[in-house]
Amino acid sequence: MSERLKLKVPASTANLGVGFDSIGLALNKFLYVEAEISDDQKWHFHHKGENLHDLPTDENHLIYQVVQFLEKRFEVTVPPLKITMRSEIPLARGLGSSASALVAGIYLADFFGQLQLSEFEMVEAATEIEGHPDNVAPVIYGGMVSGFYNNHTNETYISFIEPPRVNLVITVPSYELKTHDSRQVLPDSFKHGDAVQYSAISNTMLSALIQHDYVLAGKLMEMDGFHEPFRQKLIPEFEKVKSIAKEYKAYATVISGAGPTILTLIDPSKSGKLVRRLNKELDECSSEIIIINKSGIIAEKVYE
């Protein structure tokens, strides 16, 4: 009897302005993966659709590298796999495409390597690879997650937050922005007083979210000093999107992850009007309402 694993892996958005490298939301765009043991003892990757056409099909593939990491860490052997993938998540746009692939690799290693990892152990492994849990944790659990990775002790801490009861609008530019390039513009250090202020803003923003005070939360989201002032310069559409969103009383407009996607939080009654306006005025971008994913990754075992 042959066995296959089918994965439906959500996208994610990270930071929400002031939650740099620590807050993330799962989103209803998906990476679909099907895998089975290869007949010829070789790894095979087949990519469907435009979003994945530039990915490698050899040992440079992220999923292969993640499986190799898990094999070494847990001292198991995963048989070579035949993997088919298609994705609704655009690459290098700040919507967690690499985190989705990373988590998929962990699930494949867990299933075909018979590791029996818990969800939290998967988060730990993903965070060790990624360096922070803001994307990978919501991909696994769904919803909204805050977290911290102590790279001195190799410990991961996460906490769950009720997702905001707002609509999310994403504006996706036509160009890519690699996370590495987006991090290159960030300063190496901050003055102590500035860091204290930015941390206080982040703490207060989370408290406002928990209290469903989206006006206050949104105002604070736009007060980040850790990354947004530097990354906005790489996204020429940002200020225009933010200005238009304010006309519709949006709670906040921030950069999704490392960008260039722009995320707007808005009252559901105004989100459709905003999307139509943005699509009318920004020819080189695509705007849409996107739903918060609350289930996380879905894995289905198929036996034939």
From Swiss-Prot:
<keyword id="KW-0067">ATP-binding</keyword>
<dbReference type="InterPro" id="IPR014721">
    <property type="entry name" value="Ribsml_uS5_D2-typ_fold_subgr"/>
</dbReference>
<dbReference type="InterPro" id="IPR036554">
    <property type="entry name" value="GHMP_kinase_C_sf"/>
</dbReference>
<dbReference type="GO" id="GO:0004413">
    <property type="term" value="F:homoserine kinase activity"/>
</dbReference>
<keyword id="KW-0547">Nucleotide-binding</keyword>
<keyword id="KW-0028">Amino-acid biosynthesis</keyword>
<protein>
    <recommendedName>
        <fullName>Homoserine kinase</fullName>
        <ecNumber>2.7.1.39</ecNumber>
    </recommendedName>
</protein>
<comment type="function">
    <text>Catalyzes the ATP-dependent phosphorylation of L-homoserine to L-homoserine phosphate.</text>
</comment>
<comment type="pathway">
    <text>Amino-acid biosynthesis; L-threonine biosynthesis; L-threonine from L-aspartate: step 4/5.</text>
</comment>
<feature type="binding site">
    <location>
        <begin position="90"/>
        <end position="100"/>
    </location>
    <ligand>
        <name>ATP</name>
    </ligand>
</feature>
<dbReference type="InterPro" id="IPR020568">
    <property type="entry name" value="Ribosomal_Su5_D2-typ_SF"/>
</dbReference>
<keyword id="KW-0963">Cytoplasm</keyword>
<dbReference type="InterPro" id="IPR006204">
    <property type="entry name" value="GHMP_kinase_N_dom"/>
</dbReference>
<dbReference type="InterPro" id="IPR000870">
    <property type="entry name" value="Homoserine_kinase"/>
</dbReference>
<dbReference type="InterPro" id="IPR006203">
    <property type="entry name" value="GHMP_knse_ATP-bd_CS"/>
</dbReference>
<dbReference type="GO" id="GO:0005737">
    <property type="term" value="C:cytoplasm"/>
</dbReference>
<comment type="similarity">
    <text>Belongs to the GHMP kinase family. Homoserine kinase subfamily.</text>
</comment>
<dbReference type="GO" id="GO:0005524">
    <property type="term" value="F:ATP binding"/>
</dbReference>
<dbReference type="InterPro" id="IPR013750">
    <property type="entry name" value="GHMP_kinase_C_dom"/>
</dbReference>
<dbReference type="Pfam" id="PF00288">
    <property type="entry name" value="GHMP_kinases_N"/>
</dbReference>
<keyword id="KW-0808">Transferase</keyword>
<keyword id="KW-0418">Kinase</keyword>
<dbReference type="Pfam" id="PF08544">
    <property type="entry name" value="GHMP_kinases_C"/>
</dbReference>
<dbReference type="GO" id="GO:0009088">
    <property type="term" value="P:threonine biosynthetic process"/>
</dbReference>
<keyword id="KW-0791">Threonine biosynthesis</keyword>
